[in-house]
Amino acid sequence: MLKGKTVLLGVTGSIAAYKIAYLASALKKLHADVHVLMTKNATNFINPITFESLTGNKCLVDTFDRNFQFQVEHVSIAKKADVVMIAPASANVIGKLAHGIADDMLTTTVIACKCKKIISPAMNTNMFENPIVQDNLKILEHYGYEVIQPASGYLACGDTGAGKMPEPQTLLAYIEKEIACEKDLKGKKILVTAGPTQEAIDPVRYITNHSSGKMGYSVAKAAMLRGADVTLVSGRTAIEPPMFVKVVPIVTAKEMFDAVISVSDEQDIIIKAAAVADYRPAVVSSEKVKKKDGEMSIALERTDDILKYLGEHKKENQFLCGFSMETQNMVSNSRAKLEKKNLDMIAANNVKEKGAGFQGDTNVLTLITQEEETSLPLMSKEDAANQLLDKILMLTSNQN
């Protein structure tokens, strides 16, 4: 995902410095070229050799290191960087950067960088809330730095409050958002639905389906990484929601209908990947239905057809994509759904096909429009999401 990208990590003197080893490792696994800059104070918390072993690059600490490679090192690295993250960022380094002080390898390099800069403060609560530190952070924001607000919790000093550096996965998400993809969906508003709905029978039982939400979540994350403003309306899943996506949690089909139509008019693209119940119990018991001898029947009634409503009320130049899960006659059934519900495209898959369908991490999609069918091979749901977005981008470009 990050192949060909260069990431600079600036590490300052903080007990949280050890966490950056995990971040450096995660970035390497995504094939980024990772360079680490450390203040001398940071070397008291973690050895530079750790970062050199993880990244395969020399860890830079000393501005006057004689073992240079016939380049002005802080300038040459600054030129190749795609993004800089200073984490953990001490009050000292925040103050230096805010006022243009460049007196070590980290600060001279960061000030020489023209790329996006992200800074993650980490310190005692009283230090973080000090008006001087807050003013310095505002100065950095004014100059284009993105400031990650620290988490709250138990701190190394024994206090409890704001000042904790976020976990490496959160820091990684900020970097991915910045450089993982070309921002070819920037300026687009995209609504994605995902996951199952649950229709209560009584306070204990409900009707649902096997949807994990993985496909919809993959689409939402991919669209966000490509620069879109994404809203995700999601049923209950076991998946961590993607960062930088507005998530609207729902339970029932009625709740999903209301959530979707409340924002549908403002969307450029709607991708309905949720598995919504077609039927719900006509009457929901307020008490647990007791087991009885013999069979039990439950009267069902139709739920609102969200996709049909969206097709009937589609605004001009809005792109509407549905999903179709079939067990037989996949293409003909999906094409009928495309036409009946006034869709621009439908992503069809056969639940019986190996590697496709619910729960798994892969999918096999056929993208169907009025004019053509595009069959995709077995691939990860992340890759399938990007293929889906590529197709939508191509079709919407042709519309314009």
Task: Indicate residue ranges for each PLM-predicted region.
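A cross-family phosphate/adenosyl-ligand binding-site feature
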Residues: 1-118, 124-213, 217-400
